Amino acid sequence: MTTAATKAPERLHYTGDDESDRLLAGDPLALLIGFALDQQVPVQKAFSGPAELRRRLGHLDAGRLAAADPGQLDEAFRRRPALHRFPGAMARRVQALAAHVVERYDGDAARVWTDAADGADLERRLKALPSFGDMKVRSMLAILHHRFGVRLPGLEERLPQHPTLGDVDSPEALARYQEQKRAHKARLRAEQGAGG
């Protein structure tokens, strides 16, 4: 079996905040939580969430998050400034994600990829994560390959052919990625408007 993480980056340039960017690179659960929060908010807001949640709770431990009182976790998400546009729903998602990591990987989020047998297995493991749809899975595959050096048989053929967060290696690259994403969405809206 070929293994996964051969090199963790020093930081992932997703937030503009050095502490948050370092946490994303150094704590696999933080990275997964950032992806769980990456919905209907800017990338910077979503991926800043894990560091702020750690400040509010004093930890980012999968077992403690999974076992937390849902009301207390909800309060941590709602405290101003709220961690997300939909704090209650995201508190539940993060708790479900933590529970999944505890149940399947003994609380070690890195095992999602370090224990994967090949690209297909890694893709299955990511798809099984609560709140991870196809776009998030493809983006995670690219990040793991490009930023963490994960090399598994059959992984390269699963990598997306379009820009993803996996291509972001600097604040400038994040700005380019976000501009490309906005332009793509504008094209889709224009095509839908022309067809209707």
Model region roles, listed by residue range:
Residues 32-36:
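Short, aromatic/basic-rich helix-turn unit that serves as a nucleic-acid recognition element
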Residues 47-53:
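Short Gly/aromatic-enriched secondary-structure transition segments
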Residues 1-21, 26, 119-128, 134-196:
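C-terminal accessory module of base-excision DNA glycosylases/AP lyases that mediates lesion recognition
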Residues 38, 95, 99-102, 145-149:
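Amphipathic alpha-helical core segments of compact helical bundles
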Residues 19-30, 40-42, 84-89:
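Structural motif
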Residues 53-128:
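Alpha-helical ds-nucleic-acid-binding substructure associated with the helix-hairpin-helix region
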